[in-house]
C-alpha cells in the first residue's frame, strides 16, 4: 500500500507495507576458534578455562566470514534464540552487533544452582568478572544484556525461580548508572538488589589493570 501525504510544503510518498521480520539464524561457524581464543585470552585477559567452558557448551564461537566472536543465548529448551557478535581484533574501532532476528529476552547467560543473578552489559564483562572472582562461579547465574535493556534480566528471573538476589554489575558510567537505577526501581519490590561498581569503567578494564599490576610486581621481584 502506498501512502501519499504532505509534510510542510513537500509531498511525501512512502510504502506502508511492513517487511516481515527476518528469521533468526546463527552465523556460520569457522572451523576453529584460534583468533577468538587469542583475542579473549591474550588481549582481554579472560581465563582460558572460562573461555573453554562456554565454547564447549556451544555458547561461544568464531564466525566464518569475519572471525568475530559470537556469544549465543538460548531459551529454556537450549535452542539458540540470540547471538551477539563482537570483533576479535585488538586494533581499530570495536564492532558490536546483535544478529538480526535475535530475541532480546535470551541474551548470553549462564544458569547456576544458587540464588544470585549477576547482571552485565556486555558478554566480555561477564567473562571478565568470572575470571576476577572464579571461586564457585558455576553456582551463580549470570546474564549479559548486550546493552542496558531489562528484558534479559526479567526472563532469567522468570525461568529460574530460585533466584532471590540481583547484583547489578553494569558499567561505571552515566548510561550504566542510569540503567542500574531503572532496574533497581523495577526489581526491588520482589528481589534483594545490590549495585556492584567496577573500579574502572567496566569489569574488563578492572581485569586488564589487575593483570598489568601483577606483571609489574613480578618484574620488580625479579630485579
Give the ranges of each region predicted by the language model.
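Single conserved hydrophobic/aromatic residue that forms the stacking wall/gate
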Residues: 1-8, 12-13
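Hydrophobic (often cysteine-bearing) scaffold residues that line and stabilize catalytic clefts
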Residues: 3, 32-36, 179
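Residue-level signal for well-ordered alpha-helical scaffold segments within enzymatic catalytic domains
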Residues: 5, 38-42, 128-131
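Acidic active-site catalytic centers that drive phospho-/nucleotidyl reactions
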Residues: 8, 121, 125, 171, ...
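An exposure/low-complexity boundary signal
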Residues: 10, 14-30, 142-148, 155-157
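Basic, glycine-enriched DNA-binding surface that flanks or lies within the catalytic cores of DNA
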Residues: 14-103, 108
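Phosphate-handling DNA/RNA-contact segment within nucleic-acid enzymes
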Residues: 64-159
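TOPRIM fold recognition
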Residues: 115, 131-223
Amino acid at each position: 500500500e502506498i501512502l501519499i501525504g504532505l509534510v510542510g510544503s513537500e509531498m511525501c510518498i512512502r510504502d506502508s507495507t511492513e517487511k516481515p521480520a527476518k528469521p533468526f539464524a546463527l552465523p556460520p561457524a569457522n572451523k576453529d576458534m584460534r583468533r577468538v581464543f587469542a583475542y579473549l585470552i591474550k588481549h582481554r585477559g579472560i581465563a582460558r578455562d572460562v573461555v573453554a567452558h562456554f565454547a564447549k557448551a556451544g555458547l561461544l564461537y568464531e564466525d566464518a566470514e569475519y572471525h568475530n566472536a559470537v556469544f549465543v543465548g538460548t531459551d529454556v529448551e537450549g535452542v539458540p534464540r540470540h547471538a551477539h557478535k563482537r570483533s576479535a581484533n585488538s586494533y581499530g574501532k570495536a564492532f558490536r552487533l546483535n544478529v538480526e532476528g535475535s530475541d532480546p529476552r535470551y541474551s548470553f547467560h549462564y544458569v547456576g544452582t544458587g540464588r544470585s543473578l549477576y547482571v552485565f552489559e556486555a558478554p566480555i564483562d561477564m567473562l571478565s568478572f568470572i575470571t576476577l572472582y572464579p571461586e564457585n562461579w558455576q553456582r551463580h547465574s549470570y546474564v549479559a544484556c548486550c546493552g542496558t535493556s531489562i528484558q534479559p534480566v526479567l526472563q532469567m528471573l522468570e525461568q529460574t525461580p530460585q533466584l532471590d538476589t540481583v547484583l547489578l554489575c553494569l558499567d561505571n558510567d552515566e548510561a550504566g548508572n542510569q540503567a542500574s537505577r531503572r532496574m533497581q526501581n523495577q526489581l526491588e519490590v520482589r528481589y534483594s538488589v545490590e549495585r556492584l561498581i567496577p573500579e574502572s569503567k567496566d569489569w574488563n578494564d578492572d581485569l586488564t589493570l589487575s593483570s598489568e599490576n601483577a606483571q609489574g610486581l613480578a618484574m620488580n621481584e625479579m630485579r
